[in-house]
Amino acid sequence: MTGSRSPIPVAELRILGEYRGLLFVDKPAGLQTEPDARTTDTLLSRLATQLREPLSRLHALSRLDTGVSGVVTLGLSPDARRMVQGWRELGRFRRRYLGLATSALNATSSTSSTSSTSIGAWSESIGRASGSLRTVGGRNPESAHTDYARVASAALARATPSTLHLLALAPLTGRTHQLRVHCTAHGLPLLGDRAYGGASRFISDSGAVTALDRIALHAAWVELPLSAPFRIESPTPAFLLDIWRAFAGDATAFEQARRLAISSAELPSPSTDATDLD
């Protein structure tokens, strides 16, 4: 959690689950999802080596920014890719992210944590800003919708006059940097997200400075609309838990953030088996 970012160790990637040509992989923060002209050491290239598969066979159907960790969905066949596309068009491919964000300290904040939950939705369109960045509105904007819950909050140290929030986020669309842009637009920049105004460090009451070398955002699970529940989960990384425990003490709120229904897409409904959506 401290110091500059070091190279991601070359270790075996964790396979979280498989289903009919879909592969679910646990991406560590700091590792790019796909190769490009500048980066060849990526999740897909490492996985191709690990599985002894040609890189061309692996297609990321959900992509995580380099500084973000968690579940990445891969399609190993055209049929698998069409299956996920069908779920998306029906709004049935569910995803849950956990994030730690800050806001300005307000008059009602206290030094103790609170589990008061607020639920809502953000629906501002997102377009291009400078370089690779995105912004609300912007150039060539596209519709974007994020359901969210502010699950718990805690005051940061006296030397850092702001409030820490545990967020549960459910994107219904998949725009570039969508969650990061929406959080910042609503005064809740994610810790470590320097590109979008997030704090790059914080200071404890003892004066210790903690530098953040990743974004405090984790893709916790994806859920497939099968006749029986099929949820693929990635454990909450120690990075997020350690920060929360330092200021709020009790990390059980993370389990609530995983399970809380925060959008109509996550309410109980008759399941449709994947065979109906091919």
Segment roles from a protein language model:
Residues D26, T73, G99, Y148, ...:
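Residue-level signal for inorganic ion chemistry
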Residues L55-R92, Q178:
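Glycine/acidic-rich beta-strand-loop module
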Residues T39-L43, A48, R88-R96:
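A short alpha->loop->secondary-structure connector
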Residues M1-G17, G21, P28-T33, S112, ...:
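Pseudouridine synthases involved in rRNA/tRNA modification
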Residues L31-S45, M83, A101-H165:
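Glycine- and acidic-residue-rich catalytic/RNA-contacting loop of pseudouridine synthases
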Residues R175-C183:
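Short beta-strand segments enriched for Tyr within beta-sheet-rich domains
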Residues S62-R63, G138-N140, A211-R214:
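Short Gly/Pro-enriched turn/cap motifs at secondary-structure boundaries
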Residues G86-W87, S125, H182, D193:
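Residue-level signal for well-ordered alpha-helical positions
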